[in-house]
């Protein structure tokens, strides 16, 4: 049986990235909430990328 989580950087960025969040009013609200809370990483785009 195939596992449900098949990680891919591109899909992750496209679905949960900064530009996707900024594209809608609700997404901007998410960012505002995370800023207010003091999150170190607002979106998955802010996470360090690992060199392969």
Swiss-Prot record:
> Any idea which GO molecular function terms this record carries?
structural constituent of ribosome
| Source superkingdom | Bacteria
Q: Give the record's family classification.
A: Belongs to the bacterial ribosomal protein bL34 family.
Species in which this protein is naturally found? Amoebophilus asiaticus (strain 5a2)
Q: Which HAMAP family does its entry note?
A: Ribosomal_bL34
* UniProt protein name: Large ribosomal subunit protein bL34
User: What is any one of the record's Gene Ontology cellular component terms?
Assistant: ribonucleoprotein complex
State the InterPro entries in the record.
Ribosomal_bL34 (IPR000271), Ribosomal_bL34_CS (IPR020939)
Q: Which gene encodes it?
A: rpmH
Xref: Pfam families: Ribosomal_L34
Provide the alphabetized UniProt keywords: Ribonucleoprotein, Ribosomal protein
The taxonomic lineage of its organism, from the top, reads: Bacteria, Pseudomonadati, Bacteroidota, Cytophagia, Cytophagales
Share an example GO biological-process annotation for this protein.
translation
User: Is Secreted set as a keyword in this record?
Assistant: no
Where does the record place Basic residues bias?
A: 1-22, 31-42
- Composition-biased stretches, type Basic and acidic residues, lie in 43-52
User: Residues annotated as region Disordered?
Assistant: 1-52
